[in-house]
Amino acid sequence: MAVRVALHRHVGRAVEVMHLEDQDAVASLCGYRNADALVAALSNAGRSVSWVGDEVWARVASAKTKPVADQLLAPGVILHLGEIHLDETVDPATDPTLLLRVAASAARHKARIDRPTLDRLAQSCPPMPSPWPVGAIDDFVGLLLTAHDAIPVLEALDQRGLWVKVLPEWAPNRSKPQRNAYHRFTVDRHLWEATANAATWADRVARPDLLVLGALFHDIGKGYPGDHTEVGVTMVERIGPRLGLNADDTQMICAMVKHHLLLPDVATRRDLADSATIMMVAEE
């Protein structure tokens, strides 16, 4: 509401859309240090409101679901009335991989994670150790390969502070705005959307696991000072071994991060019919 009032004051009339050119002035009127801080706060508030609303309506729908037998999806993970629950006997504090099993199961079955289950995980689940336990990366990649079905699950984890337990490097990218004409989404949502789109190509490549991991990490450096591509490569050099990737796979993802701007830059700035352009891309 405060931002809306400030926008009206700045523009001088009742408008409902804050354009790029208005953001600096509105940020100043609202007491934010800059427009990035304002847009990040708006994004964070909007996604929280949206998530809470979705949770409420999901509970309403669940209450109308006809009882069916519970289904064991993975160790400690149960599908109950269309929602993902933890078995009462499991202790999240002793099993850091439980979080990934829950998330992967939810995405595969297009199910929401029960709110008390999210609360238990948020309160008790430890950060992923380094290196990850054997098999954890399989659940992680399995989650990402569910494409757009993964996004509501990732949002639920993020709302409860669980996603950064999986990837602590994610925190500076959370709700980070991209104030340009090339991006629709904040950095974090952009990475999720890119990963979901990449997952739809899984049957066209030999290593779909590397495809989705490269998509997830291609802009991971944007939340940090410096050239985001160079920073991202350095980060993936650390992240890959922690996840359990071997040296060759880690370097493949580093190459994806390093060159993710190559083709867009060539397509928009170079003569595609020029043999020198073709040679340059091949050499890169």
Task: Label each residue range with its predicted role.
Residues 2, 12, 28-31, 186, ...:
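Divalent metal-dependent catalytic cores for phosphoryl transfer on phosphate-bearing substrates
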Residues 1-181:
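Non-catalytic interface/linker regions that flank or bridge core catalytic/transmembrane domains
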Residues 135-214, 223-229, 234-235, 258:
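Long, K/E/R/D-enriched contiguous segments that form extended
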Residues 7, 57, 110, 198, ...:
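Generic helix-packing signal
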